[in-house]
Amino acid sequence: MRVNGIVVCRGDASVGPDDRVELDSPAPAAFPAPLRLIHEDEHLLVVDKPPGLLTIATETERERTVYRLLGDWMRARGGRRIFVVHRLDRETSGLLVFAKSVAVKRALQAQFEARMPERVYVARVEGVVTEPEGMLTGYLVEDRTLRIRAARDTRRGKEAITRYRVLERYRGATLLELALVTGRRGQIRAQLAALGHPIVGDRTYGSRRDPLRRVCLHAARLGFVHPSGRRVVFESPPPSSFRRA
């Protein structure tokens, strides 16, 4: 507070009828780094997640997650709660949508369960993919180490379908665009490893190179039906380093 241009910190300071009183508004809460805000409205938030950050808490990491960072930011603004709609692996960067109400969360999750959203990724993989485009199909299971892998016995696995097309070919590597038809956990990473083209930097799935010290997988496009009824599409270009790795 300022009285006649002078900062006053005491709450019991006397003020006369001719004094000029100014109240300083608190600075708005800064959006939490290293996230990037893509879109916000009364119904939802869309953010760009960096690699190395969990979407939600696990038993070993509860503090530094996208959900926690966004929740703290919303509370600092006097806002409402947020609700998780879907997730990205810690190693994957790119687009995530969060709901601002239970009703919106349920509506969006129903779209994901019905395979309605457009979910497109970009990945740099090891080796040269010869076919310009194609479909990755199969079944996935979780092994004893909790890693997702291709199932030999289709009766035990969950169906996984991914469309792909080649964006660029390099010496010993390929840049792919991958569109999810199903949305299984670890789907793209497991399917590309089974194909013999693990994602660059993905040591878990057999990559022998890690030039960027990250898994070269990025959620680049996310489209769905907004609660208003209109279809919306959000985009986040993949890191330029994917073309140089």
Could you describe each region identified by the protein language model?
Residues 1, 48, 90, 95, ...:
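Short glycine- and Lys/Arg-enriched binding-loop motifs that mark or flank ligand-binding interfaces
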Residues 1-149, 158, 216, 237-244:
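RNA pseudouridine synthases
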Residues 37, 125, 163-166, 199:
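Conserved hydrophobic positions within beta-strands
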Residues 47, 167-168:
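A short alpha-helix capping/helix-coil boundary motif
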Residues 56-58, 109, 151-153, 168, ...:
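Short histidine-centered beta-strand/loop micro-motifs
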Residues 86, 165, 179:
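Conserved beta-strand elements flanking the ATP-binding pocket of the protein kinase catalytic core
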Residues 155-161, 168-171, 175, 181-245:
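Pseudouridine synthases involved in rRNA/tRNA modification
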